[in-house]
Structure formats: C-alpha cells, structure tokens
Amino acid sequence: MTDIHNHKILILDFGSQYTQLIARRVREVGVFCEIFPHDIADDFIKDYHAKGIILSGGPESVYDSDVKAPEIVFELGVPVLGICYGMQTMVMQHGGEVKGADQSEFGKAIVNILKSSENIFSNLKTEQSVWMSHSDKVTQTGEHFEVIASSTNAPVAAVAHKSKPFYGVQFHPETTHTENGKQIIENFALNICKCDALWNIENIIENDIKEIKKQVGSDRVILGLSGGVDSSVVAAILHEAIGDQLTCIFVDTGLLRLNEGDQVMEVFAEHMDINVIRVNAKNRFLDALKGIGDPEEKRKIIGKLFVDIFDEEAAKIENAKWLAQGTIYSDVIESAGNSQSKAHVIKSHHNVGGLPKEMKLKLLEPLRELFKDEVRKLGLGLGLPYNMLYRHPFPGPGLGVRILGEIKKEYVETLQKADAIFTEELYKHNLYHDISQAFGVFLPVKSVGVVGDQRRYEYVIALRAVVSIDFMTATWANLPYDFLSIVSNRIVNEVKQVSRVVYDVTGKPPGTIEWE
C-alpha cells in the first residue's frame, strides 16, 4: 500500500489568516502537509522528516517582534518557502533588512519575474497578477539572497538564496486572487522539494480503511449520525472498513429540514445497508424548549438533550468500544488552544473538546487529517450523493436557531415548508450552488395580508442568502427580483400560516449569517 504520509511538507504558522489556505493548496497538488505553531520544539521539526518547510505570513511586524523562524529550519538542508512575514523573517535572519513600507499594500498587484529558471516561477510568464497584504517590506536582501521578482510598491517581491533552496515571496500564492499561485506551490512542492504526488482520494480511502481496521480490530463502533457532511462521510468510510461492526444512532430532533430524517434513513439504512437506529425525539425536544426564547439557552438545551438521548441509546449497544466522530482538520487546528498563536479563534467547535469526562469509549476520528473540501471528495469516492455532500451548511441546533424566540410545533412545520420551497426554487433556477448558504427564518410576529377576498393575519418568513468564501465575512446574495417574487408567491400561497415574505439584505459584518 502507498504511504500517503511518506512525502510531506511542514507548515509553520505565524498567525496568518491564510495559513489553512496554504495547506489546502499544497494538498491540491498531491502532497500531504500539516500546520504547526512557529515555536514548536526543534526536536519535533527535526523528527518530522519533512521534504520541505513553508513559513506562513503573520500579522506582526518583523522589526517590532521577536517572533522568528527556528534556526533549525535553515540547518536541515531541506527547501524552505517563506510567504509574506515568512519571507521577511527569513531574509532578516540571514542578514537582510526589513522596514515599514511608506504605503501598505492590500489587494491585487502586478509583479515582474526577473529570474524563473529552475525556481518557484518555472513555467510562468514574466508578468503575474498576485495578491499583496503587507505593511512592511524587504529593503536589503543581504549577501545571501537575490531578488527574483519585483513590483512597483515592493521592489523585493520575491527572493531566492544564492546557494540553498530557500525562496520567499512577499505576496500570497495560496489565495485564489494570485492567478498562478497554485503553479508556484506546485513548483515548490513537486519540483524543488521533490515530493511525489501521493495525496489523492483513492490513496486516502485505501489508507483510511487499512488504519481503521488496524485500530478497531473486531470491536464495535458507535457513530452519532446527523445527516451532515462530516458524520455522513464517517459512516460511509467506517461501513466500508468494518461493515456491521458499525452502529449509527440518528437522533431525530424534529428540528431538521423538511423530510430530512426520512432522507437520512433512505441513504444509509436502505441504500447503503448500514445499521442505523433512528430515535424519534421530536416531542422530547419540544417539551424541553417550551417557554424558552433566549437563543443561547435554546442552544444549550438542544445540545444537552441530544447528548443525553445519544448516551441512552449508546448504553443499549453491547460490547461497543469506540465512539466515532466527524472531527476534521480545521476543527483540530482552530481548537488547538496554542497560547502563542496570533490567529483569533472565531468559535469553539462541537467536535473537539466537548466529550463527556466520564466517557468510557475510545475515540475514533477517521477524518481528522482532512479539510472540508477533501471530506466532500472522499464522500463522492465512497458513493455518497452529490447533493448531500454539497448542501449548504446547517447549524447543529437546526431550525431551533432559525425560529426566533420560543419554538412551537406549528412554527417548526411552517418554517420547514417555507424553507423547502426556497431551496427547491434555488435548485430549479440553477442558483443553489452559486450561493454559499440560503435558508428561511421564522419571525414570531403576525402581519395583515389579503389572499383572494380573504383577509389574513399570519406569520412572516425572512429569506436569507449569502455569498462567502470562508463564512467569517459574507455579502448578501443579489438574487433576481423575478426569482424572489416566485419564491414569495409560492410561500404565501402554499403555506397557509404565512402572509408576508421579506428578504434579508444585511452583510456579515455587521450582521451574522444566522439570525440567532
């Protein structure tokens, strides 16, 4: 079997918002890589046996900070690529000079490649459109480095060591705004580091199945199946590896999208023949949420009750030794809790660090090394439906945070119908995959309406659709008025409890994507 970790690249993180993008681009060219804090122990770096090292960008100023690349990075004899801050500290640590730029540079820029033979710019044209994001610049390269690219505002836009395979770029090749960024990453990983492109879905599936079998043996495994992307792919890979040793518990909270519970059972229990226990807990959730209007309180109640019900069902399964979870690599990175990290943790993750202290089951995380886009590709490779894998994100508490205030059965049913119409029309008009997330929100206020000759006094549905790359910021989707008119007419005519439909035109910031 191919060892997919045999050729790998180590990424040292200086706190850049783009560090995970670097890792994703390296993996896209077929090379495994991992991210670690810049101040990780020297012995770890040495024992990692990387074929190459990438130094990320960062928010600090090189000449104001004592944050530097570990000297061992430059002593191992492996290629090094410094990006933005990574380039600046590498040059400075080799006798160069960095100063604050007269003018910060954020956005697209044109760089001119001065030397491209057998370096990171191989096979690229002289003029390249790139993405800059820096306030400092290299003013003197020192005796060891030479300039291999320049731009109007950054005369030292890229450097190469005169005798060692060390390279630096002031711009960000990992972003999609740098038109040939992937080629630059590929040149470094494959041509300079001499990595073989072993990291692909076929090899990952083969490797994961072998590792799961080795880890689990003949033990039984329990998985909480939600119908979301991560747990669905975990179910598929575990079933492929250990068959009927897997038991999935699907807690139907009643707060899912219209008919979603039936769809989950159809895909996994009927189509894939996976052992799934469906727990109809709709009434328990409604009872627990009665009279509760505070969003945070609703989240806590839903989360705790979900765990309680899961535990009740798990206790009934004899000889279970493992609990499988859909933890993915971005969860691991963002929940690492590294005190030296300059990157801000945007949110806590339900998949990491939330396990009961008294849990006696061992933890199995087959997706722990994968980013979300890799998880989706893995799911396709395992035969899961495209529409299941590429659905818009859905919050853990479900419709519980899309119904403002108290949750009632009538409100849930109303929102499910309205939301389903919105989604159906997005698919019908080929708009669904052009936007990042779209859903309905139930507003517990009534509005006067007229249908035919009848006066109606019913509820309001807000439609929300956004476009985003990373969901940390988002713009509202500029959907055609004709389309919105069709959706609005259908909802008001087909959902009797709704008399008015509004469209949310708030970006993030200042708003959040979800209303609660």
UniProtKB/Swiss-Prot annotation:
EC number per UniProt: 6.3.5.2
Subunit relationships: Homodimer.
NCBIfam families per UniProt: guaA_Cterm (TIGR00884), guaA_Nterm (TIGR00888), PRK00074.1 (NF000848)
Pathway the protein takes part in: Purine metabolism; GMP biosynthesis; GMP from XMP (L-Gln route): step 1/1
Protein function: Catalyzes the synthesis of GMP from XMP.
Highest taxon listed in the record's lineage: Bacteria
Protein's organism: Francisella philomiragia subsp. philomiragia (strain ATCC 25017 / CCUG 19701 / FSC 153 / O#319-036)
Stored Pfam families: GATase, GMP_synt_C, NAD_synthase
Annotated GO CC locations: cytosol
Alphabetic keyword roster: ATP-binding, Glutamine amidotransferase, GMP biosynthesis, Ligase, Nucleotide-binding, Purine biosynthesis
Protein name from the UniProt record: GMP synthase [glutamine-hydrolyzing]
Alphabetical list of Gene3D superfamilies matching this protein: 3.30.300.10, 3.40.50.880, HUPs (3.40.50.620)
Catalytic activity from the UniProt record: XMP + L-glutamine + ATP + H2O = GMP + L-glutamate + AMP + diphosphate + 2 H(+)
Active site, UniProt feature: 84, 172, 174
